[in-house]
């Protein structure tokens, strides 16, 4: 059975075959994760990627599976977190696909949700120009989350769709054609252990949230942190709120930690198509062009009002950050 047997009109015809291939591999990856520890150790380290990050066994397994499945498809160039350079799959192809085959793989041994993120551009004649381009030129992007439910959230530029994997039929069922980010929430996600390294506008924003009813926001907030980008995204699409992974003063974190091409760009596309916002803290993510395949960027996304507020903190002169948003009690929503 095809992985997307229902609502054939929901996927553009020129992308149907590629989506079928992505969906089929996602179903197999989900099954492999569910059997982790029975047949093999999926959490064991087996190498490092181009940026020196440790690769889990399932990182490599998933990358190989997606790459092989896309051979002979319309995908001309394939760029992966697990590959140093882009790979040519089909010289006659018309698409360029960037992918993180297994985002959040550090969570495999703890049984927390992990996922796959992907982004699709029209292919240029050569690999680098196909990928080193504006995020706004994406024609499709999405993610799969392997959790209690296996879900795919995807956009083809006309809103964000939600599919749920039916284990019985081993197919993805369209359950929502127009997912929307809730406009308001009292949740924010950030790794607070890095507070001392953050830029002042980020610290000021978090300080105001932590102050709760006694602070300028006049309400209490809850902090979340899962260390899984797809899990954080899925929660925000369901409940609203904001995710922050800012640049900081540590060596190697000056431009944040998340990769633009196959992490931030696809998530930003899905979120903005669902009515949310996505920036690097100051400027829209989709208005940026990465300088290299594995370029990093600070990342802030979520409910549009929350993202706009954080941008406004950056726009203020340093001496006004606390005064305008604190003592004067503006923007209390």
From Swiss-Prot:
Intracellular or extracellular location(s): Cytoplasm
Entry note: cofactor: Binds 2 magnesium ions per subunit.
Keyword Hydrolase among UniProt keywords: yes
SUPFAM superfamilies in the cross-refs: Carbohydrate phosphatase
InterPro entries per UniProt: FBPase_C_dom (IPR044015), FBPase_class-1 (IPR000146), FBPase_N (IPR033391), FBPtase (IPR028343), Fructose_bisphosphatase_AS (IPR020548)
Single Gene Ontology MF annotation: magnesium ion binding
UniProt cross-references to Gene3D superfamilies, sorted A to Z: 3.40.190.80, Fructose-1,6-Bisphosphatase, subunit A, domain 1
Binding of substrate, residues: 103-106, 191
Pathway this chain belongs to: Carbohydrate biosynthesis; gluconeogenesis
Top-rank taxon: Bacteria
Residue positions binding Mg(2+) 1: 81, 100, 102
A GO CC annotation given for this chain: cytosol
Cofactor(s) listed: Mg(2+)
Residues annotated as binding Mg(2+) 2: 100, 103, 263
Free-text activity regulation comment from the record: Fructose-1,6-bisphosphatase II is not light-activated.
Record key words, sorted: Carbohydrate metabolism, Cytoplasm, Hydrolase, Magnesium, Metal-binding
Family: Belongs to the FBPase class 1 family.
Assembly, per entry: Homotetramer.
HAMAP family the UniProt entry points to: FBPase_class1
Name of the featured protein: Fructose-1,6-bisphosphatase class 1 1
Classification of source organism: Bacteria, Pseudomonadati, Pseudomonadota, Alphaproteobacteria, Rhodobacterales
């Amino acid at each position: 059975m095809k992985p997307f047997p229902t609502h054939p009109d929901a996927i553009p015809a020129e992308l149907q075959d590629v989506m079928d291939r992505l969906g089929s591999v996602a179903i197999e990856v989900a099954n492999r994760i569910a059997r982790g520890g029975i047949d093999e150790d999926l959490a064991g380290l087996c190498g490092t990627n181009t940026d020196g990050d440790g690769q889990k066994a399932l990182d490599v397994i998933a990358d190989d599976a997606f790459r092989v499945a896309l051979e002979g498809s319309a995908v001309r160039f394939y760029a992966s977190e697990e590959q140093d350079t882009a790979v040519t799959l089909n010289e006659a192809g018309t698409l360029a696909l960037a992918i993180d085959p297994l985002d959040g793989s550090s969570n495999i041994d703890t049984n927390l949700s992990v996922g796959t993120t992907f982004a699709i551009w029209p292919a240029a004649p050569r690999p680098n120009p196909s990928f080193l381009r504006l995020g706004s030129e994406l024609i499709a992007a999405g993610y799969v989350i392997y959790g209690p439910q296996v879900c795919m959230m995807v956009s083809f530029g006309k809103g964000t769709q939600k599919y749920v994997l039916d284990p019985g039929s081993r197919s993805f069922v369209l359950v929502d054609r127009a997912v929307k980010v809730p406009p308001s929430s009292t949740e924010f996600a950030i790794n607070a252990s890095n507070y001392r390294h953050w830029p002042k506008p980020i610290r000021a924003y978090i300080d105001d949230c932590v102050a709760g009813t006694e602070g300028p926001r006049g309400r209490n907030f809850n902090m979340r942190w899962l260390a899984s980008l797809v899990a954080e995204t899925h929660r925000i699409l369901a409940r609203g709120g904001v995710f922050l992974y800012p640049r900081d003063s540590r060596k190697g974190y000056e431009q944040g930690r998340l990769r633009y091409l196959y992490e931030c760009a696809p998530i930003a596309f899905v979120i903005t198509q669902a009515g949310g916002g996505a920036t690097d803290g100051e400027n829209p993510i989709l208005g940026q062009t990465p300088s290299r395949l594995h370029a990093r960027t600070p990342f802030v996304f979520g409910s549009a009002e929350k993202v706009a507020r954080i941008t406004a903190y950056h726009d203020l002169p340093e001496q006004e950050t606390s005064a305008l948003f604190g003592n004067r009690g503006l923007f209390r929503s």
